[in-house]
Amino acid sequence: MYSALHNHDYYSLLDGYGSPREMLDRAKEIGLKAYAITNHGNAYAFIYYDLIKKEYPDIKMIYGCELYECEDITIKNKESKYFHLICLVRNEQGRKDLNKVITKSNFEGFYFKPRCAIEDLKPYAENFVISSACLASKLARESDFKKCIEYVNEYKSIFPHFYLEMQSHSHQDQCLYNQKILELSKITNTPFIITTDSHAPRKEDLYYQDKLIQIGRRSTNNDKNAIENSEIYEGCYMQTEEEIHECMDGQIGYENVCIGLENTNKVADLIEEVNMPFQKPQLPTFPLPDGYKDNNEFLWHLIKQGWKDRGYDKLDKESQQIRKNRLNYEMSVIHSMGFDGYFLFVWDFIKAAENLGIEVGKGRGSAAGSLVCYCCHITDIDPIKYGLIFERFLNPERVGLPDIDTDVGDRDAIIKYLVDKYGEDRVCQIINYSYITPTVAITDVGKILGFPYNQMQKLSQKFTSDKWDECMKTNPKLIIDNPQYAELFDIAKHLSGRVKTVSIHAGGIGIVDTSVNDYMPMKIGTNGEHVIQADKHYIEDIGIVKFDLLGVATLNLVKEIKDDLHLNPWDYDINNPAFENDRQTYELLASGKTNGVFQVESAGMKDLLIRLKPKLEQLDFEVISVILALYRPDSMGALDEYVEMATGGSRPPSIHPDMDEILKDTNYCMIYQEQLLDIVKKFGGRTYGGADLFRKAIGKKIVELVKKESEILRNEIVDNGYSKEIANKIADELSSKGGYLFNKSHSYSYAVLCFETAWFKAHYPTYFFKALFNQNKDKAGAINKYILDAKYFKVSVKPPNINHSGMNFTVDNGQVLFGLSAISGIGESLSKQIIEERENNGTVSYTHLRAHET
């Protein structure tokens, strides 16, 4: 029995092959005492091992990292070499310390790789076990043996738990290096360990691991480097103790192999059990203004302000009482669940956006169902007016954080605000892992094997699922009918599901009270973003509250138009009857001339608007919301049904008058999740919270679960006084359609933005197109399309003029003047030079421009 202290899984991107479970399965199979995960420069896999390690009680789980050591992290040039170094954490504090090291290596040391210096590890030395790593280590790369002795003594002087590392490989370079390590061990009196530097669970997996490396390096089977690489990795799998002896006894002798393996167990004994910080999400402390004792008091203050802002103080007593009752109920739920602070954080960054001149969306997702959100200006959709349900957003019968999604025009500026306010170590974006799908596997592996690209593109289109087995179910004869692709299919099957790349989640932001490093380390994004090494599925599981902030380009379009026109905001407020019932806007939508209009620019959407022209000409805002809710692949049947009934077709048989009342606004079609909640509440006698639990269960589309929940609902409907026939019809209707319904709060929020952009296009087409051109100035195809559309709306677009055009498109005497930076080959930099030259010398000639180009 030995401990494997140097291992890579597929979170060593395009280098390791095995999944965490595959690696631990192999560890169990060969009887390991301990297993350490040491991926290259990251901690991506830590959470996944922690989730499953209880299934392997006989194996001690050790967390570590193969770091990139360099002399000085501030030197970033080709002469700055880096080397591999293994770092294992000894205890809980060591886990946090390693997080700090990895984070710093990304933020300050990144140069091709996240690099760290020995000085960065020094403060935490007692909490680490360090080993000298592989052929890419400093000792392996140094040819001067005396210097190697100096390096070993330096490591030992800093790290009380330092080990030299041999590896059980038969490659000539490794055999020579193992002899070197043995000699260094004797001279410096330093213990050594033996590892396998495994990049795959089993020997036969190395074939597929080699293909991953080829994908990462963009090499083919015929490349000399690819052949040499497969030789170097020949022994990089999880070997049995017998295999290690077979490989190493002839190199260093049986007794030394026994010593090296025994030392791996001694290292494992040095290490305490370490766990990832799985816990309930910890809401950070909101910095209250002076004079408020707690979050609840300040939130009520904002609500009272919003009450007046929304004009509720001018409503009749009955309408006011309805809203007061709703607010009291919502606040009782929010406060009892401890979420007052969550609303304050969202309110704060939305307020900051407004102060920074950044356009904010009307709402997104289910939050528009909250009157508290509306009164606090978190959303701009009145939930009472549109019949939106609070429990669809926050259910007192289902424990879970609120999920307030916020759309903004400039996401980066809001994140900067959060970092400036709370500190860069307390705010993070969230990592996103991209896995190799069958489609990607076919094209990538086809490239390696030398198949023509077009041939692989055509073949890959037959793979329509993200899972290989599902693809085979839909194409059972694909492999049999294409024997020429046997090798391709075999490799693609084995690579499907492996991690290929990492990116940043489009919306998620984490804010913590202490430091993100207490939870997980951070990596640096392409544009300097601070990204926690935990994805959206587990960010809340490790105790971090997630806020969703999404960048929406249309909001920048709207902001630009508003800045140009300086209109009274009431003119385009959905609560203004003149705006909501503007015939010119509905006519534009019904014409299908909706290029640039939010969410309805596609050919399919335009066709749908034209089909629904009779309904739109009735000034029915509901139609826009329904279109946005139904235009999805899994709802096309319901969409056709709605169009037929909305344009004079016969309605389906009535199940019950009470159900008709709930569905009448959508032409007796069930469209929204909120309608399902109303039906379950009315007929089943449940609360909205209980009805939402039914919605969640049905939405999982698990056959047995749907049958079980439907049966419960049938009985509830009968118990509530309805006939068994009615109960069966309702339960059948909900179970068949309930999983495909849409969130009304979301569709209404987006319908408002759709209507707003259509209104600007209908009433102020010149400024609309000017802004539309600016938002697409780097897309020549889009510009040409929109110029043609502008002609239909009688908007003239003047060609660029070197002495009059600005950087961007502008309005000049009622016409749109082409912007310099949108000209192919000019860009912003040269545009600035032209404008500066113009300002200094009056005019710029074509000759002068040509001189700048050369």
Regions found by a protein language model. Give the residues of each.
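Solvent-exposed alpha-helices and their adjacent loops that cap or buttress functional pockets
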Residues: K78-E79, K122-P123, T501-S503
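Positively charged, low-complexity/disordered segments
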Residues: H852-T854
